[in-house]
């Protein structure tokens, strides 16, 4: 994967968020959730404010073999979390349950690989209320749409309600850990995970690592 040109372009920040106490960050997210939530409103907020480093530390949890999801705030309309990425961490290919999402980098960098589902042998499972898909297909066809590099000060990565599918990687060759902030509306308690090699998909429940099981 040749990322030299992408990395060079991303070294010039397009925004510089102001570090604020986590309480102020939470108050801002809560206030936005009380009104009409739009992709642009949350984008603008995350491009303007970030959790200051001394407060960020309390939300960092590190495991050697996978990323961790650490809740900062949640209500019925929105959730915000800090995700910690050890070296070499890779998520499964997944959906976002038909919700809006935003990701901004605080430390390190990540690669986002975007995909489109072209077809499966359980298309009727997508025609349900309340979730994006029941999953359960045993034959899937996926198309790779390319990659995005996400860095501090670079464009936020966003997902929309039309079943954005991606996976996220912290490449071994970078030899550094990464920390990102994710906001979703509404909160996501489960998603569809795709096993391309096995040609199947299934639903996976999600949890916060900084809360008791």
Predicted regions and their residues:
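Short beta-strand His + acidic residue motifs that chelate non-heme Fe in jelly-roll/DSBH
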Residues: 92-94, 112-113, 158-159, 165-172
